[in-house]
Amino acid sequence: MHVKGLAKLAVLAALVIGGGIYAAVPVATFAESKTLALQIALDRRGFSCNTIDGQWGRRSQVALATYCAVNGYAVPPSPELARDILFPRERNLFRTETVTQREHDALVRIPATPEGKASLKAMGYETIMEMYAERGHLTEGALRRLNPGVAWPNPPVGTVVKIPDFINGQDAKSPKVSVMRVTLSRFEITAFDEMGRLVALFPCSIAADKAKLPPEGELQVTTLIPNPDYTYTPERVSRGGRIVRRIFPPGPNNPVGTSWMGLTLPGYGIHGTPKPERIGCAESHGCFRLANWNAVRLRKMCETGTSVVIEK
């Protein structure tokens, strides 16, 4: 099916489920939630709701509807049925990890000033909670619910923590992308392979200032950089003052996160973020911002020259 046809099909499928939120079904523990299991299964296949939280909202609805549209399935009427019908044999949803001294030693405090940020060796995680939430593609609230007895935000060395298992998930099998479509009105990026098949969906943030939005049209990927640094340039300088640029070191709390894809439009790119739970709105400075794990995954699916279509 043509790329645009598939994109429209995904939108139509999303409309089928409407804007309602399904009522939560009581479960013995949060880890047994079928909504949580469904979000994990969809994420593994490249259809992301952004941060996994076990709640059935718009982003989860769109991820499910798009996955169903691509695969020719009817959209089940509830997340519980979707889990049972689409992924009845999904295994190894979770893994456990043990908090180490090395992880504690790697924590940093991110200063408020550009000078302070530039002085760091790395813009790492500020808490163990932030570290493990990102590792499991979770909201911090969901991480707490999965591990209710843990002393958050910085549990001691030796604490065992349960998170969704993405190390051995299907994300390692992601296909190569030929075209990406950035749909500004829906705050999302869809990725298509060389046959025009929709293979991934990622929520994104766009510029809050409409004047900074790139024009509609086609761009290309020019650079792919893991763990980028960031050049900070002040927006305002006092009259007669000198512009002092600062280089912020790499790390998950770097303003562009852990991945950068530069585009043929100078100054614009697709990148990560230090605040994944805020993805999906108008708040960036002009670029397209994804959760770090989605930015990394998308970068690995692309190459220089990959087409990027900007559309309303």
Annotate the PLM regions.
Residues 167, 173-273:
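Gly/Pro-biased beta-strand-loop elements
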